[in-house]
Amino acid sequence: MQKAQPKIYVVEDNPVYQTLVLKQLENITQDIRVFSTGENFLAELTCRPDLIILDYNLDGCINGYDVLKELKKLTYTSPVIFFSSNLEISVTSSILKLGVVEYIEKTIFTLPRLKTSITHILESSMGADVDTNKHEW
């Protein structure tokens, strides 16, 4: 019996970082949706993903903080990792108060940490080991 693939939503406007994050996810799941704006993400949010990776600065009218506030209003309980280059203390403090599980500075050097965090969060929330070494085709 095949394990259910974790559903991960990535909200990131930078195409380079979209690709880099997808590379970190390739051995974890194939069930990934990428959104470039907070508006598109919220408009297409029809089910509860197992994990959301969210940037702060996004194209469009709303930023990652606004997306997170809207998720809380809608009572979504999906774990959220903030992966952003915005490290202002006021932003970080506000986001942590809204319940993100991790805030990771967005650089190419922190991508391994992002992958480790994703694996740990999925194992914790899904109650099963997440296989990061091979695909189940």
Q: What residue ranges belong to the model's regions?
A:
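Acidic catalytic/metal-coordinating carboxylates
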Residues: 6, 37, 62-66
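Two-component/phosphorelay signaling modules centered on CheY-like receiver
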Residues: 14-39
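Acidic, metal-coordinating helix/loop segments flanking the phosphotransfer/catalytic sites
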Residues: 34-51, 56-59
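Short amphipathic alpha-helix used as the core "switch/output" element in two-component signaling
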Residues: 63-76
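Short, conserved "switch-loop" micro-motifs in signal-transduction and mechanochemical regulators
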Residues: 86-87
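As written
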Residues: 95-101
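Receiver (REC) domain switch/output surface
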Residues: 113-126
